[in-house]
């Protein structure tokens, strides 16, 4: 009887250690905090990369970051495999929601500043985000919740 309990307990420990806390991600995808990530080397425009991500898995999109630790994880994922400095991330249209007006209260109806692009890339060596022309092609990272 004692041997049966010991074996049962041993099997329970093995089962719990195998189930772990890692996300159930498809092969070739990496897990972090309940999400799955995959870096893709091919170059695409922002829109094409986003579309490609949505076709890879239900709920998949270009990667979003919600902590510096998550961004660091993506850097460790992209740097060795992509060997590229810039990758598309899921942030877009950051200036579209802004409302500009002059200090005298009049509306902004004339602009003469350098273009601010609407799509963002992440510099893989230091997590710096840069605005880029959405039509430029870069590698990219997809993410979905496991």
From Swiss-Prot:
Please name every pair of cysteines joined by a disulfide bond in this record. 25-36, 53-142, 119-134
Q: Which SUPFAM superfamilies match?
A: C-type lectin-like (SSF56436)
Q: Does the keyword Disulfide bond apply?
A: yes
Ranges for domain C-type lectin come to 32-143
Q: Which GO terms describe its cellular component?
A: extracellular region
Q: What is the predominant subcellular site recorded for this chain?
A: secreted
Q: Where is the signal peptide?
A: 1-23
Give the matching InterPro entries.
C-type_lectin-like, C-type_lectin-like/link_sf, C-type_lectin/snaclec_domain, C-type_lectin_CS, CTDL_fold
Matches recorded under Pfam families: Lectin_C
Q: What does this protein do?
A: Agglucetin specifically causes platelet aggregation and surface exposure of integrin alpha-IIb/beta-3 with a GPIb-(GP1BA-) dependent manner in washed platelets. It binds to human platelets in a saturable manner, and its binding is specifically blocked by anti-GP Ib mAb. It regulates endothelial cell survival and promotes angiogenesis by activating integrin alpha-v/beta-3 signaling through FAK/phosphatidylinositol 3-kinase (PI3K)/Akt pathway.
Relate the assembly described in the record. Answer: Heterotetramer of the subunits alpha-1, alpha-2, beta-1 and beta-2; disulfide-linked.
Family that this chain belongs to? Belongs to the snaclec family.
Q: What is this protein called?
A: Snaclec agglucetin subunit beta-1
Organism name: Deinagkistrodon acutus (Hundred-pace snake)
């Amino acid at each position: 009887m004692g041997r049966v309990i010991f074996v049962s307990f041993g099997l329970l420990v093995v089962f719990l250690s195998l189930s772990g806390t890692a996300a159930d991600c498809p092969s070739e995808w990496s897990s972090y905090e309940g999400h799955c990530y995959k870096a893709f080397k091919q170059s695409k425009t922002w829109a094409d990369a986003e579309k490609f991500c949505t076709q890879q898995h239900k709920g998949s999109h270009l990667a979003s970051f919600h902590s510096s630790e998550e961004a660091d994880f993506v850097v460790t994922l992209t740097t060795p495999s992509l060997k590229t400095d810039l990758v598309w991330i899921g942030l877009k249209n950051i200036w579209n929601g802004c409302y500009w007006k002059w200090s005298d209260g009049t509306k902004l109806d004339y602009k003469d500043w350098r273009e601010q692009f609407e799509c963002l890339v992440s510099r893989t060596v230091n997590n710096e985000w840069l605005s880029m022309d959405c039509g430029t092609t870069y590698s990219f990272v997809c993410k979905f919740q496991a």
